[in-house]
Amino acid sequence: NRLEFKKLKNGATLIDDTYNASLDSIKSSLELLIKREGKRKIAIIGDVLELGTFSKNLHEEIGKVLLNSDLDYIITIGNETKYTDEYLKNNNYDNLKHFNNENESYEYINNLLKDGDLVLFKGSHGMHLSNIIKYLVDNQK
């Protein structure tokens, strides 16, 4: 999906931008997140797929972009975003959590979100982040 907004029962707003991902599209989506109103701004970032040998460098670059985005919390999901997570930790960013796949993250994200949160979901379509959004919409109390 491309920039679809969904309001949860608990008052959190999700930004579903899970159709595709590149460094530039992640930057654009983060700019949108930063400009909008929200008590807490949270980014949930999945792998950018099909990068081959460039993957580690690009996912570290994503870490740099996230570090400079003044976010309240970051969640990374996938095998390649471990490089994003490592970059953030090495630069003393502590408000983050990494999951190897989306199935591990459902309950954690569901429990994390609160009224007023603005949450960006961004990653390659093959990362299935849209499944998390569907779960949250269906299971939010």
Residue locations for each model-derived region?
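ATP-dependent carboxylate-amine ligase
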Residues: 1-141
